[in-house]
Amino acid sequence: MAEVSSSTVRRPFHRRRKTCPFSGANAPKIDYKDVRLLQRYISERGKIVPSRITAVSQKKQRELAKAIKRARFLGLLPYVVA
């Protein structure tokens, strides 16, 4: 059998998990009227960016999605960007 030397074995790279931008003392409140904040979590095509990319917690992602949908309904944000 072939022996694997320790110099050729690569250890997997572990990326440090980013913290949620909406948790903490100075965190912004999620509000459907704050269009500038909501636009940071919408893609160029108008889709809601998933939490695995933005590092938003599951609870705050639900709040964010609800606020974006409410702002779209009221005409503050577009549904689709052509």
Swiss-Prot record:
- Record keywords: Ribonucleoprotein, Ribosomal protein, RNA-binding, rRNA-binding
| A single BP term in Gene Ontology | translation
Region annotation (Disordered) maps to 1-20
Q: Which GO terms describe its cellular component?
A: cytosolic small ribosomal subunit
Leader peptide range in chain numbering: none
Pfam families found in the cross-reference section: Ribosomal_S18 (PF01084)
Q: Which family does it belong to?
A: Belongs to the bacterial ribosomal protein bS18 family.
Question: What's the protein called, per UniProt?
Answer: Small ribosomal subunit protein bS18
Q: Which organism is it from?
A: Allorhizobium ampelinum (strain ATCC BAA-846 / DSM 112012 / S4)
Record gene name: rpsR
